[in-house]
UniProtKB/Swiss-Prot annotation:
Subcellular location: Nucleus; Cytoplasm; Cell junction; Cytoplasm, Perinuclear region
Record region (Disordered): 1-27
This protein's UniProt keywords: Actin-binding, Calcium, Cell junction, Cytoplasm, Metal-binding, Nucleus, Protein transport, Repeat, Transport
Annotated source species: Gallus gallus (Chicken)
Domain EF-hand: 758-793, 799-834
Primary gene name: ACTN4
Amino-acid positions noted as binding Ca(2+) 2 in the UniProt annotation, renumbered to this chain: D812, N814, S816, S818
Calponin-homology (CH) domain boundaries: 43-147, 156-262
Family: Belongs to the alpha-actinin family.
GO molecular function: actin filament binding; calcium ion binding; transcription coactivator activity
Protein name: Alpha-actinin-4
CDD domains linked: CH_ACTN_rpt1 (cd21214), CH_ACTN_rpt2 (cd21216), EFh (cd00051), SPEC (cd00176)
Length: 904
């Protein structure tokens, strides 16, 4: 018997649970009768045990309300035991006295003890007195014996069997893991899983949520009560709000599910047994149907195949007989093997079916009439009998037809070759291509005709062979002799026609050859004289149409003289043209007399009379055109010469004037007469005189435009071009403007740096001394020599090179490789005058800042104009020193950045 105390938990009603000897309420030595239950557990047990008792008492038409009061007289206790056991108990005593009640309870306890349950620890007096703990313990003992003890799953029973049953049923469900009868059931999913496993239509399991246990529990309780007739024995709130639900209450309720579904399992077992029997029967019926269909199909195939094998009617051609042989071999190779397999499978299926029927106590299978295995074997024997000799008969027929078919094929091949050779021959012999042929064509046609005559004679043997084969096929009674005879007759008739046409064509070719030889001599004469004359006309046309390009009067006068000489040769050329055309007319007369259609092309030349006449007419048209073109060009060259002289006269005045002005400007920029203001005034007057000269340049531009419009590209009367004049004018304006700007910058530098007039003249003298080419700029070596002359230590050593590179970076920051006079003055002024420095600006900011190392925005706005103050605030970096105040600005880095000593 199963030990319900295997988990080592104390038995709450004073016993050790079922022991090895099957006792359910073994007495404990240390049992305290006054020990009270956990209030939550007691509440759960009262509700569960009451509902369980009522689920059985209602069968007797009664129920209890208070479990520890309603069982005190023992009457309903005895009734409960009769209902759940199905046995009659001794007649109860109906008295109201205490002794009557004790006797009734003892009768109930004696009945429980008779079922192998130890009830020594349960006293009838305590039940009669309404001891709740003892009453609940007694009911739990009854539940164990009559509701749980009989549960058996595999080799486990009672509690372990019920737990294993729950685990098996809920295993497929997510979030369900039944390990006990307390906390495994708190979320309600296990109850719902049990119901869904047996009655899936009652529960929508996928919609349940593990985090909503009250809803899950109520759903399971309501469905069980409504559809499974299992009363609600538990409260969802009690289970959820209890850390560890009462195990006995849960077991009692779960056992009701077990008993409710056990009936369904029995019905399912019975249904499975019926289905198994029906499945065997259906399988047998399916095998019977398969046998009937397979046998019917096989017999039908045999019935259709035997007449085909028995047909021995000969065919006309070897191809047809070979096809029959191929069909037979295809039958033996493709069609028959599956049928052999079907016949074998049919016998196997029949034997298997009979064995299954015999083993399942079914009557033997009797196929339909004519579909017995013996009927199939008989039909198969007839089939194999029909096969015998069929292949041998086919091979004999093929051997008989093979020579005859070979002879017929030989006839067809020779006839086809001959017909292919004769194709187009009649049309070729009938054509009159010689009427339009040249002499060389006629000779080629005669040689070609001779070759054809040789080929015709060679084909005579083939025609005779074709006729002989046709005669042999007639004698062997070939089935297609009529078509052979018709084809042979057609070949013979065509052969006679070809012979007649060959003779007629030879005569026509020889006659035409003689006539064309005469015409050919005339064509040769024509070609010898037409070719040189045609070349002369083409050369003349090229010369008359030649695009002459002349630039002088002398050149056009030479062209006019050459043209006059050409015109003097035209009468002799016209007489030669008439003689050449007369030769062509004579050749055409002979062709017309003998009905010869000339192709129109002289084989010796491509120059036709039409070409000669066309080119001669073209020469006649080009001569006056050339006359007019030469006269027009002569007039144009005379006009161009006048334009050249006009432009040269003006250019020879403007060019030297600009050159003189350029030299004077260079001299003014170098010489140092008077003050800078005097030089500036003199240069501006000089600039105005240059601007006043511009109308002369505009007049020259007008003359140049006329020259360009006349497409005059050279002028021997002057060395000046308009491009030279324009460049010189632009250079003149640029030079005077640059020189004025240099003087203005020198004045600005002098005033800003406090340079005296004597110092400025000294700087100019030094600069001019080393500006050897008078270009207005010093190269690096010239500048170094100048610095050395002024006392700077820039000799060719390491220290001197470093100093020179520093100075060059100041005067030539762009790295152009030259030093202008303005850059030279700036450098010298910085070296000789007092200038602002970064240190001076830092000192000024320190005064504004009150001798602090930083300055604030308020101090800048207070001491500087608004625009300069905001400029400084926007560009000054925050001051990071240890004495920095909020909003402190770094005026030192700002000052050094102003002079390029750091980044702004």
């Amino acid at each position: 018997m199963v030990d319900y105390h295997s988990a080592g938990q104390p038995y709450p009603y004073g016993g050790n649970g079922p022991g090895p000897n099957g006792d359910y309420m073994a007495q404990e030595d240390d049992w305290d009768r006054d020990l009270l239950l956990d209030p939550a557990w007691e509440k759960q047990q009262r509700k569960t045990f009451t509902a369980w008792c009522n689920s059985h008492l209602r069968k007797a038409g009664t129920q209890i309300e208070n479990i520890d009061e309603d069982f005190r007289d023992g009457l309903k206790l005895m009734l409960l035991l009769e209902v759940i056991s199905g046995e009659r108990l001794p007649k109860p005593e109906r008295g109201k006295m205490r002794v009557h009640k004790i006797n009734n309870v003892n009768k109930a306890l004696d009945f429980i003890a008779s079922k192998g349950v130890n009830v020594v620890s349960i006293g009838a007096e305590e039940i009669v007195d309404g001891n709740a703990k003892m009453t609940l313990g007694m009911i739990w003992t009854i539940i164990l014996r009559f509701a749980i003890q009989d549960i058996s799953v595999e080799e486990t029973s009672a509690k372990e069997g019920l737990l294993l049953w729950c685990q098996r049923k809920t295993a497929p469900y997510k979030n369900v893991n039944v390990q006990n009868f307390h906390i495994s059931w708190k979320d309600g999913l296990a109850f719902n899983a049990l119901i869904h496993r047996h009655r899936p239509e009652l529960i929508e399991y996928d919609k349940l949520r593990k985090d909503d246990p009250v809803t899950n529990l109520n759903n399971a309780f309501e469905v069980a009560e409504k559809y499974l007739d299992i009363p609600k024995m538990l409260d969802a709130e009690d289970i959820v709000n209890t850390a560890r639900p009462d195990e006995k209450a849960i077991m009692t309720y779960v056992s009701s599910f077990y008993h409710a579904f056990s009936g369904a399992q029995k019905a399912e077992t019975a249904a499975n047994r019926i289905c198994k029997v029906l499945a065997v029967n259906q399988e047998n019926e399916h095998l019977m149907e398969d046998y009937e269909k397979l046998a019917s199909d096989l017999l039908e195939w045999i019935r259709r195949t035997i007449p085909w094998l028995e047909d021995r009617s000969p065919q006309k051609t070897i191809q047809e007989m070979q096809q029959k042989l191929e069909d037979f071999r295809d039958y033996r190779r493709v069609h028959k093997p599956p049928k052999v397999q079907e016949k074998c499978q049919l016998e196997i299926n029949f034997n298997t079916l009979q064995t299954k029927l015999r083993l399942s106590n079914r009557p033997a299978f009797m196929p339909s009439e004519g579909r017995m295995v013996s009927d199939i074997n008989t039909g198969w024997q007839h089939l194999e009998q029909a096969e015998k000799g069929y292949e041998e008969w086919l091979l004999n027929e093929i051997r008989r037809l093979e020579p005859l078919d070979h002879l017929a094929e030989k006839f067809r091949q020779k006839a086809s070759i001959h017909e292919a050779w004769t194709e187009g021959k009649e049309a070729m012999l009938k054509q009159k291509d010689y009427e339009t042929a040249t002499l060389s064509d006629i000779k080629a046609l005669i040689r070609k005709h001779e070759a054809f005559e040789s080929d015709l004679a060679a084909h005579q043997d083939r025609v005779e062979q074709i006729a002989a084969i046709a005669q042999e096929l007639n004698e062997l009674d070939y089935y297609d002799s009529p078509s052979v005879n018709a084809r042979c007759q057609k070949i013979c008739d065509q052969w006679d026609v070809l012979g007649s046409l060959t003779h007629s064509r030879r005569e026509a070719l020889e006659k035409t050859e003689k006539q064309l030889e005469t015409i050919d001599e005339l064509h040769l004469e024509y070609a010898k004289r037409a070719a040189p004359f045609n070349n002369w006309m083409e050369s003349a046309m090229e010369d008359l149409q030649d695009m002459f390009i002349v630039h002088t009067i002398e050149e056009i006068e030479g062209l006019i003289a050459a043209h006059d000489q050409f015109k003097a040769t035209l009468p002799d050329a016209d007489r030669e043209r008439e003689a050449i055309l007369g030769i062509q007319r004579e050749a055409q007369r002979i062709a017309d007399l003998h009905s010869i259609k000339l192709s129109g092309n002289n084989p010796y030349t491509s120059v036709t009379p039409q070409v000669i006449n066309s080119k001669w007419e073209r020469v006649q048209q080009l001569v006056p055109t050339r006359d007019r073109a030469l006269q027009d060009e002569q007039s144009r060259q005379q006009c161009n010469e006048r334009l050249r002289r006009q432009f040269a006269g003006q250019a020879n005045i403007v060019g030297p004037w600009m050159q003189t002005k350029m030299e004077e400007i260079g001299r003014i920029s170098i010489e140092m007469h008077g003050t800078l203001e005097d030089q500036l005034q003199h240069l501006k007057h000089y600039e105005q005189s240059i601007v006043d000269y511009k109308p002369n340049l505009e007049l020259l531009e007008h003359e140049h435009q006329l020259v360009e419009e006349a497409l005059i590209f050279d002028n021997k009367h002057t060395n000046y071009t308009m491009e030279h004049i324009r460049v010189g004018w632009e250079q003149l304006l640029t030079t005077i403007a640059r020189t004025i700007n240099e003087v203005e910058n020198q004045i600005l530098t002098r005033d800003a740096k406090g340079i005296s007039q004597e110092q400025m003249q000294e700087f100019r003298a030094s600069f001019n001394h080393f500006d050897k080419d008078h270009c207005g700029a010093l190269g690096p070596e010239e500048f170094k020599a100048c610095l050395i002359s002024l006392g700077y230590d820039v000799e060719n050593d390491r220290q001197g090179d470093a100093e020179f590179n520093r100075i060059m970076s100041l005067v030539d920051p762009n790295g152009s490789g030259s030093v202008t006079f303005q850059a030279f003055i700036d450098f010298m002024s910085r070296e000789t005058t007092d200038t602002d420095t970064a240190d001076q600006v830092i000192a000024s900011f320190k005064v504004l800042a009150g001798d602090k190392n930083y300055i604030t925005a308020e101090e800048l706005r207070r001491e500087l104009p608004p625009e300069q103050a905001e400029y400084c605030i926007a560009r000054m970096a925050p001051y990071r020193g240890p004495d920095a105040a909020p909003g402190a600005l770094d005026y030192k880095s700002f000052s050094t950045a102003l002079y390029g000593e750091s980044d702004l």
